[in-house]
């Protein structure tokens, strides 16, 4: 079924912090890192059990986006092509992951709004 607004916000936070944020930081500091898979189904129950508020989740999501934006602004043009590898999804560059950060948030924004209205 559909996730609630809280479940969706928790997912968005987990992905920005533990997937895209971590992978981007590894690309900034490592040569051709190999990225681990993110088992969302295993991670989500523990993440939801923390009982974080909507406000806390939003603050974390916004803060992580702002921090990544500052880090990305400092990346020289030639470095945007730096790559790491995911065992299942293949090559991922800084540019690809930076785009996914924004796309992922946009993909879930309408879902969060609809879930909040349906409450």
What is the predicted function of each stretch?
Residues 1-40, 66-69, 73, 83-119:
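Short, contiguous alpha-helical
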Residues 41-81:
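Acidic/histidine-rich alpha-helical segments that form the ligand environment
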């Amino acid at each position: 079924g559909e996730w609630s607004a809280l479940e969706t916000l928790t997912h968005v936070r987990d992905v920005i912090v533990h997937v895209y944020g971590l992978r981007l930081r590894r690309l900034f500091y490592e040569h051709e890192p190999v990225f681990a898979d993110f088992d969302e189904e295993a991670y989500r129950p523990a993440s939801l059990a923390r009982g974080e508020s909507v406000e806390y989740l939003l603050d974390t999501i916004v803060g992580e986006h702002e921090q990544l934006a500052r880090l990305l602004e400092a990346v020289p043009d030639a470095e945007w092509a730096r790559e790491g590898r995911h065992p299942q999804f293949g090559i991922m560059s800084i540019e690809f992951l930076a785009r996914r950060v924004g796309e992922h948030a946009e993909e879930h924004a309408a879902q969060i709004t609809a879930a909040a209205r349906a409450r």
